[in-house]
C-alpha cells in the first residue's frame, strides 16, 4: 500500500464546534483613523447545539451579507483550525475561544492548512464535503475585532482556514469526526496554495500550474490564470480594507 493511501485511511479531525449566523445591519463604528460607516455582516455566529442540516450552499440557519465574495457552491462552509488560537490569543481581546471567532462555521481540531489539500474529500456526519480553496480574510474580520490590519495578518501567517463545497447534503453535529475519504491532489496543500497566491506573486509558472487544478474554486483559478498571463487582477486592499484602503 502506498504511503498516500495509508494517509487517506488514517487522517481524521474533529469538528469541535459548529456556528451559524444570519446577516445583520450594524451601526457605524470608528476603527483607528478610519471614518465610521454602517455595515452589514454575517460574521457574528452562534454555537449550534445538536444536529444541524447541511445544505448544498450553507448550514441551516446560516447566511452571508456579501454574496459576491462569500457563500455559494464553492464557499458553502468556512472552516478554521482551533490550533491557531495560541497565536491569536495574544492579539485578540478575547481570552478564551468559544468557537466562531473568525466567522467560521466549523471549528476543527487536529487538521491545519499544512495537513489538507485542495480537492480533499471528507465525511462529516451523513454529509460529504470537499476543500475548494483557502479562505481569503476580508475587512469585516478586522472590523469585528477592531484591528485594522487583521485580515492582512491572517493572510501573512497562512492561518487562513479554508472552504468546503458540499458534495452530499446531510446532517452534521459538533464533537464528531471529520474523516478523509479521497486525496486527488496531494501536491496542493492549502499552505502551498496560500503561499503561491499571497507570497510568490512573481512565480508565474506556479500560478499557472495551480490554476489548472480542476477542483480549485473558479475564482481562484481565474485570479491565478490572470496573474500567469500578466493580466490585471483584483487589488487585494479592497478585500482587506474595504472602501477605505486608499
Annotate each predicted stretch with a short phrase.
Residues 2-142, 149, 185-246:
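Electropositive, beta-rich accessory/interaction domains or terminal extensions
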Residues 102-111, 154-164:
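Short, structured beta-strand/loop micro-motifs enriched in basic residues and often containing a Trp
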Residues 119, 169, 173-176:
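Loop/turn positions that initiate beta-strands
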Residues 131, 164-166:
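Short beta-strand His + acidic residue motifs that chelate non-heme Fe in jelly-roll/DSBH
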Residues 160-161, 175, 190:
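Hydrophobic, well-ordered secondary-structure segments
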Residues 178-181:
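Short hydrophobic beta/alpha edge segments that flank linear recognition/processing sites
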Amino acid at each position: 500500500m502506498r504511503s498516500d493511501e495509508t494517509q487517506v485511511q488514517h487522517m481524521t479531525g474533529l469538528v469541535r464546534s459548529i456556528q451559524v449566523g444570519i446577516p445583520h445591519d450594524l451601526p457605524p463604528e470608528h476603527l483607528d483613523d478610519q471614518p465610521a460607516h454602517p455595515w452589514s455582516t454575517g460574521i457574528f455566529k452562534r454555537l449550534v447545539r445538536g444536529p444541524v442540516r447541511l445544505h448544498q450552499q450553507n448550514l441551516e440557519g446560516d447566511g452571508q451579507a456579501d454574496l459576491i465574495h462569500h457563500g455559494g457552491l464553492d464557499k458553502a462552509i468556512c472552516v478554521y483550525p482551533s490550533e491557531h488560537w495560541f497565536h491569536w490569543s495574544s492579539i485578540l481581546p478575547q481570552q478564551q475561544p468559544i468557537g466562531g471567532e473568525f466567522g467560521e462555521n466549523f471549528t476543527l481540531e487536529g487538521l491545519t492548512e499544512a495537513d489538507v489539500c485542495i480537492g480533499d474529500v471528507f465525511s462529516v456526519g451523513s454529509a460529504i464535503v470537499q476543500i475548494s480553496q483557502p479562505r481569503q480574510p476580508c475587512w469585516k474580520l478586522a472590523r469585528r475585532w477592531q484591528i485594522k490590519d487583521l485580515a492582512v495578518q491572517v493572510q501573512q501567517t497562512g492561518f487562513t482556514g479554508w472552504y468546503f463545497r458540499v458534495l452530499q447534503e446531510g446532517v452534521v453535529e459538533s464533537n464528531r469526526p471529520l474523516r478523509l475519504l479521497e486525496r486527488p491532489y496531494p501536491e496542493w496543500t492549502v499552505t502551498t496554495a496560500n503561499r503561491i497566491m499571497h507570497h510568490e506573486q512573481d512565480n508565474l509558472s506556479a500560478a499557472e500550474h495551480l490554476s489548472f487544478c480542476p477542483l480549485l474554486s473558479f475564482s481562484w483559478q481565474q485570479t491565478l490564470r490572470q496573474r500567469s498571463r500578466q493580466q490585471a487582477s483584483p487589488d487585494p486592499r479592497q478585500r482587506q480594507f474595504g472602501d477605505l484602503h486608499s
